[in-house]
Amino acid sequence: FISIKDLTAVLGVTRSTTDRYLKRLEELKKIKRVQGGAMPKQSDFSFCPSWYYQDDDPFYQERVALGKKAAELIGDMECVFLGGGRNILHLAKRLVNRKICVVTNSLPVSLLLAGTDNEVNVVGAVPISDEGILIGNSNSNLAVQKAFIAPGSLDEEGFCNHSQLIVEFEKEFIAKAKEVVAIVDTQKFQMTSPYRICSYEDVDGVILPNSAPDDYKAIFKNNKARTYYV
């Protein structure tokens, strides 16, 4: 059980906004509304399908390695933007015992880091997917040193995503950040998405598996972005 009061405090939003979150999550059949709060419909308080977290995900170990490498790029006391997705969640797991400022539009990330020594700022107002990703007000006053994104796919020109709303939201933080890092797992090389997040020239670093296709390795080798293989 989590109370509306506690969830409102964690997210730093108004009670009415929390009510909208819970209503949407109930519509997605992720929670059950009860008096004063909500209960999970799964065994853990997850806004995502069980495979989102568990090692029955065929790319689980790869995501763990990608998240570990990404966390190594974050210095203590830095302010970073963390987008949504499983790869980002594995990065967030490595930050539980750190002390940094996190700006995120991911409900799973914000709840994972709540109660730690990290300062967590949740941006966005409306959950638009069963992964608990928020869009809406990005808070133009927030400045970040680094932005970490997990694109849904790649093509010859850059990183893409399936949702235009998510793309437009992440573009704001890509423009704000002094450094942008993309985290890419093997699955993303096999997928296509209609909306472009940014070109390869717009990122400063790319973290990807050693199993990445040779043609993409060649693209990154000829690009200004630092490439990290795991």
Place the predicted regions along the sequence by residue.
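Short, active-site-adjacent cap segments at secondary-structure transitions
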Residues: M39-P40, I88-H90, S110, D155-E156
